[in-house]
């Protein structure tokens, strides 16, 4: 990806280091919003934005190095602050009947297995930006589908 963007190692490190700050920043914004907007609504919007951004990245990844990729790439970790916090809160609510420890363990296991499967897929192609965009889109769509299905089956609408 660094070569596709045409970044020096230093510029790449600073850019993605700055991106990493977007996750706690968006999480702080989420903490304020969740008092007024239901967590499920915030999660759905974050996943929709994540999927839309990934979809926009696909043609940009196909056309070669582009500075236009950078702001779109920044939106992915920004949405992670909303997705992680709200998905975890809603999941804990759904599984609290089996016990907090068991539920937390199951969630952690699932996250690590998913990361182990998804990470190689993102870099499987020679065009890393394309692989990342396709994988991000697929993950956002699957997650959104899960939120819709679980939300429909839940008696609790939050």
Task: Describe the residue ranges of each PLM region.
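Transmembrane alpha-helical segments of major facilitator superfamily
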Residues: 15-23, 111
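Helix-to-loop junctions at the C-terminal end of transmembrane segments
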Residues: 26-41, 126
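C-terminal transmembrane helical hairpin of 12-TM major facilitator-type secondary transporters
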Residues: 41-87
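Residue-level signature of mid-helix packing/kink "hotspots" within the transmembrane helices
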Residues: 20-28, 116
């Amino acid at each position: 990806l660094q070569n596709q963007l045409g970044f020096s190692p230093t510029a790449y490190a600073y850019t993605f280091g700055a991106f990493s700050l977007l996750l706690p920043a968006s999480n702080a914004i989420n903490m304020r919003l969740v008092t007024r907007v239901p967590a499920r609504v915030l999660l759905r919007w974050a996943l929709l934005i994540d999927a839309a951004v990934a979809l926009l990245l696909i043609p940009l990844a196909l056309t070669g190095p582009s500075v236009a990729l950078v702001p779109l790439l920044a939106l992915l970790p920004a949405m992670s602050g909303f997705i992680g916090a709200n998905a975890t809160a809603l999941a804990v609510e759904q599984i609290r009947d089996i016990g907090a420890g068991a539920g937390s363990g199951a969630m952690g296991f699932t996250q690590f297995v998913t990361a182990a499967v998804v990470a190689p897929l993102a870099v499987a192609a020679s065009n890393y930006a394309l692989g990342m965009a396709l994988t991000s889109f697929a993950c956002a769509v699957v997650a959104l589908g899960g939120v819709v299905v679980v939300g429909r089956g839940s008696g609790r609408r939050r």
